Amino acid sequence: MNIDIKISLYKLVHCKFFDPDQMNIFLKSLKGIAEETRLRILALCGKTELSVSELTSILNQSQPRVSRHLKLLVEAGLLERFREGPWAFYRASEKDRPDGFAPALLALIPLNDPVFEEDRARLEMVRQNRISKAESFFKQNAKEWDGIRRLH
């Protein structure tokens, strides 16, 4: 077992609860990851910000199902939701929590597992698709770009 995993396990096992609410936060976080799809989502959102449609594509699951998992992860404090224009994106929580749970958990995810490896391969395809769409958009709109920027 490498030193990073030992440190993460230590942090996970020795979480300090500063008040009764901390215990509830910790238990809610445990419930939040108590399902394979949610653990996969957390691993993906620990790498980059993703939209619901991108996650449905990577996970090959329905939008309602992915949205439900995202809701539970946000409520557990493991993911953050933010809007960018009409889209909602999710990322691993950057909030500083005294229990150190989310970073410790991310360090323990078995990334060499075939399921996580497949997810990362599909994530790379999503990233490449984003790049292609952005390049295409700017090629099509380069001449009018100054006018487009004035609209926003």
Where are these regions (language model features)?
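A general structural signal for well-ordered secondary-structure junctions
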Residues: 36-39, 51, 79, 132, ...
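Alpha-helical residues within the helix-turn-helix
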Residues: 57, 74-75
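Beta-hairpin "wing" of winged helix-turn-helix
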Residues: 75-84, 91-93
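N-terminal helix-turn-helix DNA-binding core of bacterial DNA-binding proteins
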Residues: 24-65, 86-96
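Short, hydrophobic-biased segments on the C-terminal half of alpha helices
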Residues: 70-71
